[in-house]
Every structure is written in structure tokens, then in C-alpha cells.
Amino acid sequence: DQARFFRPQGVLWVGERIYVADTENHALREVDLQSRMVKTLAGNGRQGHWVQSPQDGKLTQLSSPWDLAHEGGFIFIAMAGLHQIWAYHTETGKVGPFAGSGYENIVDGPLGEAQFAQPSGIAISGNYMFVADSEVSAVRRIDLAHKVVQTAVGEGLFVFGHRDGPLEEARLQHPLGVACEGNRVYVADTYNHAIRLIDLAEQRVSTLVGKPEMKTVCNIADPSCDTLGLFEPSDVKARGSLLYIADTNNHLVRIFDLEKKVLRTLAVKE
């Protein structure tokens, strides 16, 4: 009850610990649910700059960490401020760049040569990490086995829109969140006020929730709220047949049933 955060954006639950991307404190924090203690794993509250190799987390400055994912003893960090993906080793406490050169662009290739532009959301499925690469309106895919970065959807800083269809023709606009299950990648397509589906098996993008013309603010007291559109959703999580959506500028959590194709608002009692 004494710990403080500053505009945290991403959380990750692993066992009895919750890890927090404490964005404007430029830090990675850990919440121990058993001891009820909060500690800082990496960052010192000051915005950092590019580093070449892993360093002691407590001595390393981060830059706008935005989202987290966990795999094989590492916590991966979408380091939006440095246009990179970083990795924190839970055993050694060291943190440093994992993917991205630090230059802002959309360039595929080996981990150290690839370029991102404000990566803001990450999720892992099998041997792949998916990244919501916001400033280039793209979703990138990191092959963890072969250590290369590929682009699933998107082309560049000035190529954006709301278009469904084949991967090479589809358009997103400043996506901030991503979730994945097998060959299905769900995207919080923030500036399109939509949730999009990237079907890797069919190599196509479709819109699950939201239309370009629907930008109405949702009032939770209005019984018709569930029929209104999303307003700049910033993240999405998949659990079974349900998608949980951070409907940010409506200040709501929404639930989309993939089987029934129904959108509703999460009640507090749930």
C-alpha cells in the first residue's frame, strides 16, 4: 500500500508474481503476491538511452517500457522509447537489447539489424513473438528459433488505413496491443477503433470488432452501450473463446465472444 507507479501500461502474471511495465517511471517492477511487496528489477526512474549489451538491471536506465511477455527464463520488454525489444533475465538480473538496432523504421532481418518503430505490444506463441509496431502501423513476427524479424502486416511510417484482405494488402493504423493463439493473431488496432484478426494459416486480415465510421463514446449508464463501437482500444487478451479488450477512451473493459460474435461490457462482479 506504499508503493507507487507512474502510468504503467503492461502487466504480466507469472506464478505468484506480477511484472509491471512502469512506463513513465522507465522501470520494470515486480509485485510479489505472497509477501505483498513491490520492487524494481530494472530502471532507476530516469529515461535511458541505447545500450549495446546486457547490464545489471538496477544500474540500467530504460525508456518507456510498454508491454511484457515471458518465455524461458526471460521477461521480454517492448521498449517503445528505444524502438527495440529488450530481455530481462530472471536469474541473473541483467537486462539489455534482444531485437532491434535502435533506429526507427520497418526493416526485417537478423535480430541486431532489424528496425522497429515504437513497439508497444508483444505476445508469444510457440517459437514466435508478435509485436505491435505502432508508428509503422505494423505487426512484426520474431522467429525465436532462427533469430530473425519478419513483417506480417504493414509497410512503413506513412502507410496506414483500415483495409481487410491478404496480408500484403491489409492496413492497420497505430496498433498498440497484440495477442496470439496458434495461427491466430488478435490486434488492438487503436486508431481504427477496432480489433483485427490476422489469420496466418489463410494469410488474411479481417475485422472482428469495430468499423471505421464508429467512433461514438460509450456511456456505461446507457443500456445500449454494448452496441456502440470501441474508442481507441489499447490492448487485447485471448482466453478460450473470449477476447478481453482494453477499451481505453471509453474507460471500459469489453468482452467479445468469438463464437457468438457478441460484444459486451465487463461487469464489475465478473
Protein language model regions, located:
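Gly/Pro-rich loop segments of beta-rich domains
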Residues: 1-9, 37-64, 94-118, 148-176, ...
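Short coil/turn segments that connect the beta-strands within blades of beta-propeller domains
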Residues: 15-16, 72-73, 126-127, 182-183, ...
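Conserved beta-strand positions in repeat-built beta-propeller and related beta-rich domains
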Residues: 20-24, 77-81, 131-135, 187-191, ...
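A short loop-to-beta-strand structural motif that recurs across blades of beta-propeller domains
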Residues: 26-29, 37, 83-86, 137-140, ...
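Short loop/turn segments that connect beta-strands within beta-propeller blades
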Residues: 32-36, 89-93, 143-147, 199-203, ...
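Blade-level signature of beta-propeller repeat domains, shared across WD40, Kelch, NHL, RCC1
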Residues: 237-270
